Amino acid sequence: MQQNTSATAQPGSTVDAAEIAKFSKLSAEWWDPKGKMAPLHRINPLRLGYIRDAACRKFERNVRSLNCLGGLRVLDIGCGAGLLCEPLSRLGAQVIGVDPSQSNIAAAKLHADKSHLAIDYRCTTVEEIDPRERFDIVLAMEVVEHVVDVGVFLKRCAAMLKPNGLMVVSTLNRNWKSFALAIVGAEYVLRWLPRGTHEWNKFVTPDELTKYLLDNRLVITEQTGVVYSPFADKWTLSSDMDVNYMVVAEGMV
C-alpha cells in the first residue's frame, strides 16, 4: 500500500502537525455555510442521513424518531468545529468530539453553547483517549486522508468500539479521477477548498481501506460512493466510488 512519507508526527501519534495547522487556520469559518467550509455544509445532510440510517438498522431504532440515537455513545474523530456532532446530539446521541486543533475545539464549544447542546468536546488525539473508553459508534469522516499512518490510526479506532459496535469511515479514493476532481477541480478551478487542503498521495483506495478494517476484525456491512451533481447542486449516494466514498463496518461479537 502506498504511504505518505513526507508527513511529520509526534512519536506514537498518527497526527500530522502540518494538517493541524492547516485546518486551525479555518477554525473561524467552520460554521459559515458560504465560507471556505461550504463543501462540508453541502455534504453534511447526506453524511448525517447515512450515519443515522446505518445506526438505526444496526441498533434497531425507529429512523423517524427525533430521538432515534438516544443512549448511544458516539465518538467523532477529527470533529472540527462540530458540524456532525451537533445534529447527532439533537438525535439523542451522547456525542464526544475530538480534534487536535485547539482553535477548532474552541469554535465547537462556542457554537454548542449558543445552540444549548451538551457535547463533550476534547482537544486531543485518538491515541490519547483513555484506552478503557468504549463507544457504540466511531466516526472517521474525511479524516484518514489527513493522518500519517492509516493502519495505526484505524487500529486505534477499532479498539475503541464496543463489541458489535459500528464504525463509519468516509474518505477519498486514490486515482487520476480523484486527482482531477478533488484537487485540480475543487481546489484550483472551482476554488471550493483552499489550495493544499488535500494531498493526493494520502488518499486511500477502497481495497486498502477494506484490508485495514478486516485486519482489525471488523466486518464491512455496506459501502457507497458519494457524487456531486452540479445541475442539482447537491450530493447524492451512488455506486460510483471513484472519488468520494463511505464505508460502514461492524465489530465482531
Curated annotation (Swiss-Prot):
Quote the pathway field.
Answer: Cofactor biosynthesis; ubiquinone biosynthesis
Q: Which InterPro entries match?
A: SAM-dependent_MTases_sf, UbiG_MeTrfase
Which catalysed reactions does the entry list for this protein?
Answer: a 3-demethylubiquinol + S-adenosyl-L-methionine = a ubiquinol + S-adenosyl-L-homocysteine + H(+); a 3-(all-trans-polyprenyl)benzene-1,2-diol + S-adenosyl-L-methionine = a 2-methoxy-6-(all-trans-polyprenyl)phenol + S-adenosyl-L-homocysteine + H(+)
Q: What is an example of a GO molecular function annotated in this UniProt entry?
A: 2-polyprenyl-6-hydroxyphenol methylase activity
Q: What is its EC number?
A: 2.1.1.222, 2.1.1.64
Chain positions recorded as S-adenosyl-L-methionine binding sites: R47, G78, D99, M141
Q: What is its EC class? A: transferase
Q: Does the keyword Methyltransferase apply?
A: yes
Key words, A-Z: Methyltransferase, S-adenosyl-L-methionine, Transferase, Ubiquinone biosynthesis
Described purpose of this protein according to its UniProt entry: O-methyltransferase that catalyzes the 2 O-methylation steps in the ubiquinone biosynthetic pathway.
The name of this protein is: Ubiquinone biosynthesis O-methyltransferase
Can you name the source organism? Bradyrhizobium diazoefficiens (strain JCM 10833 / BCRC 13528 / IAM 13628 / NBRC 14792 / USDA 110)
Phylogenetic lineage: Bacteria, Pseudomonadati, Pseudomonadota, Alphaproteobacteria, Hyphomicrobiales
